[in-house]
Structure formats: structure tokens, C-alpha cells
């Protein structure tokens, strides 16, 4: 299994530019009641937001909001369960951001799909088109083909991609310069309520 999610799955800022100015305190209030498609974090909201701010220093509060309400917790839970079976699991986390809407779109929900299928030049509203997204797309689509042929994405142009294990949380972070990182948000996810 190859599983991918994006950094900013449920980012609200691309629809409302005023939300770019949100503060961390305002993010806490927003995630008390609602966290993406899930119920809010209630009394844990401050702990969750602080954990993500610590794990991702230098990120704007709007980005912390998106990271803390993304689907990554579910992706990791699925990978943990699937890794108990004999077939390998590979996990990716898409962080590439299009140069559109003054950067507000970020790595939004499903933007990675056109990269996997070599369609970045057809999805100008998602990527802006051109050489920059195409370079990553070529590597991602070749890696997906390798995975479809062999059950292993290696050999497609991305860095060496180890199988996912719950102990290390090996995750291919997809961006202009892709790299494998061991469970890059593990400490932050510990603050989240259980699924």
C-alpha cells in the first residue's frame, strides 16, 4: 500500500485571505469547536496547537491550524495497521506549495493527485504549470509506476524510500527537494485526541 496526504489538507486561507492574519490564540478558539471534518479538540485545543507550533517552528498560525486539523493522524493509524500484514506500506506526505493566490493555497487536499498522474500541466489552477511542478511530478509518477509494477516505489527518481514501520514512521516528504523523514510530526500527534 502507498498512502499519501498533504500538509495543509483542510486549509481555510485559500478561500478567505483575511485568515492569513489569524493568531495562534484564534487558532486555539477555532479548533475547540471544529477540527477539519472532526469534532473540535475542546479543552485540549491549546495543547494541540502548542504541540504543532513546537513541531513546526517558523510556520504561520494559519499553517499550524491546517497541520493540526489534517488527516495525517488517520493516515498514520492506517499505515500502522496495514504494516502488520505481509505486504509493504509506503507513506508520503505532500508539502509542495503552488505559487498561486499569494501562496494561500499551500499543499491543499488532493493537490498531489495531478502529480502522481503526470498532469501538472493540465491542472494550472492547482499547480500554476511549468517546469517546477513538472520536475516533482515526473519523479512521483515514475515512482507510482514502479510501485504498481513491483510493489516498491524505488527507482522512480525520488530518494531511497524505505518501507514504513510503526517504530520509525518512515515518511517520504514530497517537495521540490524530497526527503525521507522519520515520523516528522509524531510528537505533535501525541497531543491529538484518539481517533
Per-segment meaning from a language model:
Residues 100-104, 169-171, 182-184:
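Short, solvent-exposed polar/charged micro-motifs at secondary-structure junctions
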